[in-house]
């Protein structure tokens, strides 16, 4: 009887990379690692640029040298496609869809979950999926589907800090951890202010694209997140810079 297929879900964050490193270290079966890249538009990744560079220039080559097959998935739809689409029913019918809702993200649904679901439909019955959930994330571990989803981090008693250290030792810790403790698209409405400040300071071209989208008329919502327009955040950072300049001049 053939063994089931084993795949690893990989965002190239510390937990999913540590899972793959543990699989290789302990001889756990692993047929391929699967990564879904959300795109801002047809040419620009939704990954924070430092993380995308790490994925393609460091992590994927390193894993391939270890013999890990990498599958990269992408949706035909992009963030800009969804943003500029039109509402088709209800009181806002005909308006530009605009920013995704926090907690009900159409980008997550259409650009990430659906490509993964299409991939999973072609997997053989009984496929086992390694999920990067650490030993100290008990609530998330309890939600794993028994037999079909496995945490190697829990199996080998690895906490999130252990995962960090394993990746760091292997030279596979993403540079995004220098300014955030979470993964996510650079246009995510759940992004914290330090993440947005990093985008503002280091990637003004991407920041400008978001301001261009904010300026589109006839949107179903003006809010980037639960409380602010993207232009409000832009004003906030400009004011911070102005105050800092005054302090330096004093």
Residue ranges and their predicted role:
Residues 1-250:
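Nucleotide-activated chemistry modules centered on ATP-dependent adenylation/adenylyltransferase
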């Amino acid at each position: 009887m053939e063994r089931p297929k084993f795949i690893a879900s990989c965002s190239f964050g510390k937990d999913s990379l540590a899972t793959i490193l543990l699989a290789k270290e302990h001889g756990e079966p692993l047929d391929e690692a699967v990564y879904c890249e959300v795109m801002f538009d047809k040419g620009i990744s939704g990954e924070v640029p430092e993380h995308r560079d790490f994925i393609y220039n460091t992590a994927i080559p390193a894993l391939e040298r270890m013999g890990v097959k990498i599958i990269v998935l992408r949706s035909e739809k992009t963030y800009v496609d969804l943003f500029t689409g039109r509402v088709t029913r209800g009181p806002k019918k005909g308006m530009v869809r605009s920013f995704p809702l926090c907690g009900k993200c159409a980008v997550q649904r259409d650009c990430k979950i659906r490509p993964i679901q299409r991939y999973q439909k072609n997997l053989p019955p009984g496929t086992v999926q390694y999920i990067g959930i650490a030993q100290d994330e008990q609530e998330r571990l309890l939600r794993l589907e028994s037999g079909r989803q496995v945490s190697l981090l829990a199996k080998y008693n690895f906490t999130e800090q252990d995962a960090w250290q394993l990746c760091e030792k292997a030279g596979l810790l993403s540079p995004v951890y220098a300014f955030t403790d979470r993964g996510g698209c650079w246009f995510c409405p759940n992004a914290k202010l330090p993440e947005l400040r990093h985008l503002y300071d280091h990637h003004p071209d991407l920041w400008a694209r978001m301001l261009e989208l904010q300026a589109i008329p006839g949107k179903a919502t003006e809010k980037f997140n639960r409380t602010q327009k993207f232009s409000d955040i832009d004003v906030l950072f400009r004011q911070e810079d102005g105050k800092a300049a005054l302090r330096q001049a004093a």
